[in-house]
Amino acid sequence: MMILSILATVVLLGALFYHRVSLFISSLILLAWTAALGVAGLWSAWVLVPLAIILVPFNFAPMRKSMISAPVFRGFRKVMPPMSRTEKEAIDAGTTWWEGDLFQGKPDWKKLHNYPQPRLTAEEQAFLDGPVEEACRMANDFQITHELADLPPELWAYLKEHRFFAMIIKKEYGGLEFSAYAQSRVLQKLSGVSGILAITVGVPNSLGPGELLQHYGTDEQKDHYLPRLARGQEIPCFALTSPEAGSDAGAIPDTGIVCMGEWQGQQVLGMRLTWNKRYITLAPIATVLGLAFKLSDPEKLLGGAEDLGITCALIPTTTPGVEIGRRHFPLNVPFQNGPTLGKDVFVPIDYIIGGPKMAGQGWRMLVECLSVGRGITLPSNSTGGVKSVALATGAYAHIRRQFKISIGKMEGIEEPLARIAGNAYVMDAAASLITYGIMLGEKPAVLSAIVKYHCTHRGQQSIIDAMDITGGKGIMLGQSNFLARAYQGAPIAITVEGANILTRSMMIFGQGAIRCHPYVLEEMEAAKNNDVNVFDKLLFKHIGHVGSNKVRSFWLGLTRGLTSSTPTGDATKRYYQHLNRLSANLALLSDVSMAVLGGSLKRRERISARLGDILSQLYLASAVLKRYDDEGRNEADLPLVHWGVQDALYQAEQAMDDLLQNFPNRVVAGLLNVVIFPTGRHYLAPSDKLDHKVAKILQVPNATRSRIGRGQYLTPSEHNPVGLLEEALVDVIAADPIHQRICKELGKNLPFTRLDELAHNALAKGLIDKDEAAILVKAEESRLRSINVDDFDPEELATKPVKLPEKVRKVEAA
């Protein structure tokens, strides 16, 4: 009985930690339990004495502070990693949303499902059905990329007329004031037609003058610029990146010096600016330049410090000394992008966004706004491109036949095709969920980094898979190619607004560990403020948090999550339970990593990256489950849900295993392995059988396939190869049973080619009627259009045709 009572006590302790019961209540329960065991004669009543001696200091604050918290506080202040001003501003910027729940080890799934699903307003839907549809029809991506290296003038004019550049600008200034969800849908639709079109519209609606002015501009700046930006009268760009500072944007060398100078014939207080920027989208054609630079005030003309820090100003490009116009040439996807320079350019101090009082506040302004733009524009562009590519590749895989069968029925094709379909579903779920948070007023900085990285990364991988499937059709550029420019341009999204290597290795967990953790940021603030009283309360909450996640990790690993709560009892029930387990694992691994590695964790980028991978996969899986719930839990969509969540579970577990295999403290790694994997690894990547189901969805028209491609431009217009493939898929499917019947009548397995000739012969023999013959003829036209590629006269391809030397006439000897 003694052994059983000890085991029962251990179970009780575990239950208290598991359910996160407060320290005081837990102490009372332990004392009552021990007393009950004493009354029952199982334990000596004297055990209460040492137990009370142990528990009293923990519950009596003055004693606890002097004996425990104060020494820990002193040690914490010594090992706390140094934080630069820019790092602090980045961490302080924005808010924590659903990713905070995932990070804390006990997600509230009901809260996730109660987040309201965004809906398009009638105005937003009309814009998508009208101006956006027309802009897509007008866009000829081959002409844009190969012939013009720009949007055609009539398309530029149309975008300005219909205020495409004003989606984020408030209506009081003449803007559209669309929701984040509507912006995402617009960009997805445009991206499926032309990457250049989507980038051109997306950038002014992301981080730039419009966004910064609305948040920080003076009334005079807003009244002057916002209506002009809304009408397209002004074209904005924002210059941050320089040759010496790319990912390390806080190290920009561009300078401004506060001084007096002549402006329009008068001596005014202003700034003398020198900059050298590159990779600036819309810079070659911009009329107003947003500029980030480091401002100093050596004469203290503003009355404050000398070194003011990063500042943002708005400068008309007609200002003397501003150099724009030259272009970069990014991967044959020639959107307007180029350098801008200026040397000793004098401008009034009022050109600072927000006026002189915002001098030195530029970095805070940027990071506060960046999470919104980064969370919408890049994920939406990548997602829209993949959604259209998914439909087109699925259609092509059905239409294209080799060895007398559709290539989509071959297992070698099914594997990448399933990845494309699964990624399209997951990316759309992830890109949509973050818009929910933004529409609720959140500025989820960590979540925007997750969505930016994984949508662009999965987008690139999906485009590569599509190229492998389509082969020559995807390689040969021309009017009928739906893939090659997306393939060429994929690295652009990978690189901009936080290069993906940086984002994964430093930003997701680097910010998430502090921003999403329930206690670390407040503990750091308490240490900075030398407030041991606040630190004491946080410390013991933190200790309970770690203990809870340790118990939860072990128990949920032992039971594979079977005892944890779930909001549903259907086919997705086990996924919630698995995610409960992984969330506890992440919380434990994060705390242990921070405790063992301390400030050096910032430099252990591969450890940080793997912790970020776990958090990211938890988000992607929860986004899939949220999408499935929001769309009515359609069982036909379950193959995509299974694929998305199983892929996330497998990758998260792989990241945990890799982390433990490479954890620098091998003793701690061994202990963590026992707690996290008490019965070993269990999650598998999506099976071949599941891949088969998912790949099949893309190859025939159905409701699930339509949901994958929701909102995309699928009209079979002249310059829309995706829409033409959709039309061809319907034509070929309509012809297939007629072809099979003819084969059966003739007793031959005829190839699915020359259907027009087959129609003529079968009609002559009375095997089919005229309507069926017409179906076969149309299918053959569509089939040939789908599999054929473009060819050109040599002169059409050369920007500078080679001039062959004139032949020298031979002079015969006399």
Swiss-Prot record:
Lipid metabolism as UniProt keyword: yes
Cofactor (UniProt): FAD
Stated name of the protein: Acyl-coenzyme A dehydrogenase
Transmembrane in keyword set: no
EC number(s) given by UniProt: 1.3.8.7, 1.3.8.8
UniProt-listed InterPro entries: Acyl-CoA_dehydrogenase, Acyl-CoA_Oxase/DH_mid-dom, Acyl-CoA_Oxase/DH_mid-dom_sf, AcylCo_DH-like_C, AcylCo_DH/oxidase_C, AcylCoA_DH/ox_N, AcylCoA_DH/ox_N_sf, AcylCoA_DH/oxidase_NM_dom_sf
A Gene Ontology biological process term: fatty acid beta-oxidation using acyl-CoA dehydrogenase
Annotated function: Catalyzes the dehydrogenation of acyl-coenzymes A (acyl-CoAs) to 2-enoyl-CoAs, the first step of the beta-oxidation cycle of fatty acid degradation. Is required for the utilization of medium- and long-chain fatty acids as sole carbon sources for growth.
Catalytic activity entry: a medium-chain 2,3-saturated fatty acyl-CoA + oxidized [electron-transfer flavoprotein] + H(+) = a medium-chain (2E)-enoyl-CoA + reduced [electron-transfer flavoprotein]; a long-chain 2,3-saturated fatty acyl-CoA + oxidized [electron-transfer flavoprotein] + H(+) = a long-chain (2E)-enoyl-CoA + reduced [electron-transfer flavoprotein]
Pfam families per UniProt: ACDH_C, Acyl-CoA_dh_1, Acyl-CoA_dh_M, Acyl-CoA_dh_N
Organism per entry: Escherichia coli O157:H7
Pathway participation: Lipid metabolism; fatty acid beta-oxidation
Signal sequence annotation: none
GO cellular component: cytoplasm
NCBIfam families on file: FadE_coli (NF038187), PRK09463.1 (NF007000), PRK13026.1 (NF009586)
Positions of the catalytic residues: E497 (proton acceptor)
Family: Belongs to the acyl-CoA dehydrogenase family.
Molecular function via GO: flavin adenine dinucleotide binding; long-chain fatty acyl-CoA dehydrogenase activity; medium-chain fatty acyl-CoA dehydrogenase activity
Keywords, in A-Z order: FAD, Fatty acid metabolism, Flavoprotein, Lipid metabolism, Oxidoreductase
